[in-house]
Every structure is written in structure tokens, then in C-alpha cells.
């Protein structure tokens, strides 16, 4: 398998800025979250993609939207792109959706002003009144 990308954590400074802005958390709370960030990984040898993990577990009531600073940036070879999709089971069974349907991370985003920090915006579109958790 050809390696075209490598995942990294954003700097602690960048994460604290983004996390506190998105969640209203204190700096000390954000530092604790930063320490728990896990890099994306393949679940099995045959996995088609990498699993991303939310830095914290979130619960969403129906119709609620959340913006998640992942703490992750990705170094991608020129000419390649990272595509982000919601986990199929959460979308298919429970209507948890990414607000832009598919997240597109271009190879030059790694050098963006925010260090290429990847954010995910999700909405609980569940019509059965079910609260959903993201981990």
C-alpha cells in the first residue's frame, strides 16, 4: 500500500485557541483534552480508511450541531486529498451527519495559518428523538 499522508497533532497553542473558542472551555480543561488526542488509525489491515476520534465524547440531542476541533493535521503528498466521511453505521442507522457531507482536506492545508487544524461539524438529524454520542 502506498503511503501518501502522515497525521500529526497540531501544536498545543493552536489547539488551546481553537478548542476554547469552539467549546467555551477553560485553558486548563483544553490542556487536559489535548493530552488525550489520538492520531487517526486503521482499525484493520483491510480498512478502506482511517478512523478519526473525537478528543472528548459529545452527546447531541436531535437537531443539535457541534463543531469539533480534532487536534489533528495531515501532511499529504501533492496531488492527493484527504476525504472525511461520517462512520457509516452512525449515519445509516442514526442519521448523524457531517454538515458538508464530505470533508475535503487539500494537500496545501497543512501549511495554513491555523496549522491545517482539521475541524468536523456534525448534526444529529435523528427523527426518533434519540440522543447520539460521538467519541
What are these regions (language model features)?
Residues 1-135:
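Non-catalytic terminal segments and appended small domains
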Amino acid at each position: 500500500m502506498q503511503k501518501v499522508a502522515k497525521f500529526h497533532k497540531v501544536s498545543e497553542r493552536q489547539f488551546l485557541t481553537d478548542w476554547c473558542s469552539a467549546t467555551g472551555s477553560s485553558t486548563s480543561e483544553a490542556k487536559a483534552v489535548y493530552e488525550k488526542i489520538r492520531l487517526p488509525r486503521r482499525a484493520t489491515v483491510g480498512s478502506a480508511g482511517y478512523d478519526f476520534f473525537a478528543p472528548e465524547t459529545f452527546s447531541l440531542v436531535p437537531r443539535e450541531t457541534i463543531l469539533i476541533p480534532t487536534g489533528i493535521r495531515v501532511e499529504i503528498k501533492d496531488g492527493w486529498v484527504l476525504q472525511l466521511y461520517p462512520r457509516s453505521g452512525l449515519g445509516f442507522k442514526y442519521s448523524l451527519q457531517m454538515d458538508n457531507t464530505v470533508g475535503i482536506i487539500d494537500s496545501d492545508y497543512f501549511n495554513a495559518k491555523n496549522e491545517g487544524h482539521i475541524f468536523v461539524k456534525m448534526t444529529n438529524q435523528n427523527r426518533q428523538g434519540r440522543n447520539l454520542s460521538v467519541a
